[in-house]
Amino acid sequence: MRFGAWYPLSAAGDLSPEGEGVLQLRLATGLVDYPHGKSAMVWYQHARELRTAARALAVRFADKDLVCRHLIDVDAAVDLAAFCAKLREDFERRFGRVPELEP
């Protein structure tokens, strides 16, 4: 499993797949200052309906210059919710807090 290429969040409703998946959002330019470093990453999400979730994020963050990518070559045996939770945990451990736009 790996993440595909980045694309504008505004296009995510057309470019993200239907069905279950995981996506990431990052700043199109620049970095966020986190307690333990800098990163452009601002959001991780698992969704049962990824395209629907991507469309909702595009509306929610329409005022921000963000890009999106989603998992491709997904292994059907992998628990995607657990995979996404691990990404978040790893991010928080490395950078000292959750991604910038997450609650």
At which residue positions do the language-model features occur?
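GIY-YIG nuclease catalytic motif and its immediate N-terminal context
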Residues: 1-57, 74-93, 101-103
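A short hydrophobic beta-strand segment most commonly corresponding to one strand
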Residues: 66-74
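Conserved micro-motifs of the catalytic ATP-binding
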Residues: 96
